[in-house]
Design a protein with these regions (language model features):
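PLP-dependent enzyme catalytic core of the Aspartate aminotransferase-like
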Residues: 3, 58, 62-66, 70, ...
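N-terminal "arm"/small-domain region of PLP-dependent enzymes with the aminotransferase-like
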Residues: 5-73, 202
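Conserved N-terminal alpha-helix of the aminotransferase class I/II PLP-enzyme fold
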Residues: 62, 66-110
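Conserved PLP-anchoring active-site segment centered on the Schiff-base-forming lysine
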Residues: 117-136
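Active-site phosphate-binding strand-loop segment of PLP-dependent enzymes
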Residues: 150, 154-206
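Active-site PLP attachment segment
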Residues: 223-258
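Structural motif of enzymes handling amino- and sulfur-group chemistry
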Residues: 271-290, 296, 300-305, 309-311
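Conserved PLP-binding catalytic core of the aspartate aminotransferase-like
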Residues: 295-302, 309-344, 354, 358-359, ...
């Protein structure tokens, strides 16, 4: 058998392209934040993670431009060698303070943050315990480690307890959860997870890629529950509320120091470019100086949740700016996506394995910079499309 046979036999995506219902890798010709353009077709963007709308904020843009002028376009090296600027260390210091931890470590992407952190910490005699809805980067980081992976049903703390009971007391244990689950917009049940972890001698890591800047007055999901000091590690990315690219892990200084010297995804990757680091720093400053943006994005999300529910859509357990429209069928999910796209609304169709079978959905997400007129227009188009294909009465 030829290794490439599977490549030549893979036809699903090409069939979707031929039928005009391929929803991925859409090349936008303009991106103004809340609105985008594809081949001259203007759409309201309800599929972005730009929660605070900071990609177009003047202070963030200017910081990136000035960093390029001062440092150039790239560090052309690993953080471990020549790729660390004072900007990186300044950002690490400010992030640690923002999330209430002793130290932080900046990686080049969020994916690399999880790959480097989890694989560095999990050894042969250790167990990593994952929520079944955890992000793929957490799963891949766990696979790169030499320990054993255990999984429990989504936010099912009774199942988590059974898993912990089954693990030998001698094993090191790390529970990893998304703070804000990225597909359905619900929050990890940290008020129950944290005391259970303490009971079994397990450490807790929260991947707050989607929660940072949104929950806990911007400080994240652990802060929202008053558990910042009780959570051992807090991870986030810069590609959402921070309007940039990169990621970080924060925790006690000895732990961060260890990851710094054992995280292969950090050591063997080029460092995040100056513009990205400067943009993230500026975004953090905007979060401090303009907290009304954090309130605004949550107000917009509540408006849309209520609007969708009044129309008859199922928004699941969403509590955040990620608001799913649960459809439960592949064909209807793609059909709804196509009709919404043609009508001027950009959303993301999500099917298995990204969600469990029967939970296929349209992932919508909202920004602080969406206007009331834009949001009303989105509800109007959803109402029309939903009725046309039988999603709502």
């Amino acid at each position: 058998m030829d290794l490439f046979d599977k490549c030549h036999n893979y036809t699903e995506a090409k069939e979707a392209i031929a039928h005009g219902i391929y929803p991925f890798f859409i090349p936008l010709t303009d991106n103004e934040g809340t609105e985008v353009v594809f081949k001259g077709h203007r759409l309201i963007m309800c599929g972005s993670n730009n929660y605070l709308g900071l990609t177009t904020h003047p202070k963030v843009r200017e910081a990136a431009i000035e960093a390029i002028k001062k440092y150039g376009t790239s560090c052309t090296g690993s953080r471990f060698l020549n790729g660390t600027l004072e900007l990186h260390e300044r950002l690490e210091s400010e992030l640690a303070e923002w999330v209430g931890k002793e130290a932080a470590l900046v990686f080049s992407t969020g994916m690399q943050t999880n790959l480097g952190t989890v694989s560095a910490l999990i050894g042969r005699d250790d167990r990593v315990i994952l929520d079944k809805d955890d992000h793929a980067s957490i799963v891949d980081g766990a696979r790169l480690g030499y320990g054993r992976i255990e999984r429990y049903n989504h936010n099912d703390i009774d199942h988590l307890e059974r898993v912990l009971v089954s693990i030998p007391e001698t094993a090191g244990k790390l529970i990893i959860v998304d703070g804000l689950f990225s597909m359905e917009g619900d929050l990890a049940d940290l008020p129950r997870i944290v005391p259970m972890a303490k009971r079994f001698g397990a450490r807790v890591m929260v991947d707050d890629a989607h929660g940072m800047g949104v929950t806990g007055q911007g400080h994240g999901t652990a802060a929202q529950f008053g558990l910042t000091k009780d959570v051992d590690l807090i991870m986030s990315t810069f590609s959402k509320s921070f309007a940039s690219l990169g990621g970080f892990i924060a925790g006690d200084e000895p732990v961060i120091h260890y990851i710094k010297h054992h995280g292969r995804a950090l050591i063997f990757s080029a460092s995040a470019p100056p513009a990205n680091i400067a943009a993230a720093l500026a975004a953090l400053e905007v979060m401090r100086s303009e907290p009304e943006l954090i309130q605004r994005v949550n107000d917009n999300a509540e408006k849309m949740r209520k609007g969708f529910q009044e129309l008859g859509f199922d928004t699941g357990a969403s509590q955040t700016p990620v608001v799913p429209i649960i459809i439960g069928d592949n064909d209807k999910t793609f059909l709804a996506w196509k009709m919404l796209f043609d009508a001027g609304v950009f959303v993301n169709p999500v099917i298995s394995p990204a969600v469990q079978p029967g939970r296929q959905l349209l992932r919508t997400s909202y920004m602080a910079t969406h206007t009331d007129d834009q949001l009303e227009r989105v509800l109007e188009i959803f109402s029309r499309v939903g009725r046309k294909i039988g999603l709502i009465p």
